[in-house]
Amino acid sequence: MGRIVAIDYGEKRTGFAISDPLKMIVSSFVTVLSRKAVMYLKNCTENYDIELFVLGEPRQMDYTPSENMPRVEKFKRNLRRVIPSIDVQMVDERFTSVLAHRIMIEGGVKKIKRQDKGLVDRLSAAILLQTYLEFLRK
């Protein structure tokens, strides 16, 4: 059984989360510079049995595309070109950053650590993946 990788793509940084092979457990994985994200994922496919990429779809509250949508769509095209054997599913990413901050506050994470944008990106990717896996179980 393959793993699923969630991608929280941003203008500067991209956060990743990965499932276990049984798709039961989500782990916050790593944050990389966005310009290196596709090649990082290509390397991951050599070390992990990845069956699907779940990419956060940036939308406004009224479901219209956010200003990051063109960058995300370009990233998706590039990802499909470089790794054509793995499908890319778009998933609504609204509220993932808000939830990431809330989880850190409720978890007692100190303010200085909550300002680590890479941590927020990884946690947002983990929330995205957890939401996707819960959807699959329904």
Curated annotation (Swiss-Prot):
SMART domains: YqgFc. One of its GO terms (biological process) is rRNA 5'-end processing. Keywords: Cytoplasm, Hydrolase, Nuclease, Ribosome biogenesis. The keyword Hydrolase applies. It is found in: Cytoplasm. Pfam families: RuvX (PF03652). InterPro entries: RNaseH-like_sf (IPR012337), YqgF (IPR005227), YqgF/RNaseH-like_dom (IPR006641), YqgF/RNaseH-like_dom_sf (IPR037027). Its EC number is 3.1.-.-. One of its GO terms (molecular function) is nuclease activity. One of its GO terms (cellular component) is cytosol. Could be a nuclease involved in processing of the 5'-end of pre-16S rRNA. NCBIfam families: RNAse_H_YqgF. Belongs to the YqgF nuclease family. HAMAP family: Nuclease_YqgF. This is Putative pre-16S rRNA nuclease. It comes from Azobacteroides pseudotrichonymphae genomovar. CFP2.
